[in-house]
């Protein structure tokens, strides 16, 4: 692995924003630059690990975490070029979590093609995920070459390390309540705060820190990231029912197959009739004992979620977090970057993948 991040950064990267189409969350210049940096990171590497990391990183995803870091840095008064290495590393860390998640969940597809563990084997996938995590920290340290002070780099490292620790706790909590329909919404929200929102928060806070932002800017952008992460995860729960596998690039039955509790299922069990509750219990029991077809299980659950209003209630909760995320930005000076962050919060609950 070669850490090229930052070496091709253009200090004149635009702070203004072209109109953002629905499917885009970054100005085209940022997307192009980030993708170029990803290619440089693995260029020339002829070892198996390099090949697997290239496979994991491409095709690129939504690049949401890099946008949060880049735009948070600029919104806090810094320059995107100075924090580019950290943005590259943030995407590497995110991809690492996907590689490991697919192994834990037994999901065979990711972004419309075989998951890393299916393409290269379980052991190699674990190692590649680990390598991408460590590469994240190296990229953060590489911000020194762009002129970021050591004190800010150390602070950003601490924020990201804490987020990684929180993510592990969130993953553990998810395993603890797996298939337990008595799990309440409060426990679920704590789980996604740890598992998902923590890394959103870290991307925003580390961008603000590395960009030279004030303590208030770091706090506000962290709160924005918390609410954005919650909105994003709840909407993710809904995509299985609102989108197709072709749109999402992953199986619609993954949550049910893994007996993973989502907000719609929790709300349906809390508010549903005795018959609805029994249906959910029978489905999870059948999946656990392999006595029910996965597609039939999905259809049965979908009917219960529609009948109880759990899908619409979950959409409302996601929209509430999206709104709260946007409210945090009011404290920051008006800027194109703050506007783009607000756009991301809206996009988080309107996307179809």
PLM region spans:
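Short, charged, amphipathic alpha-helical segments
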Residues: 21, 154, 222, 316, ...
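A short structural micro-motif
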Residues: 163-166, 227-228, 286-290, 307, ...
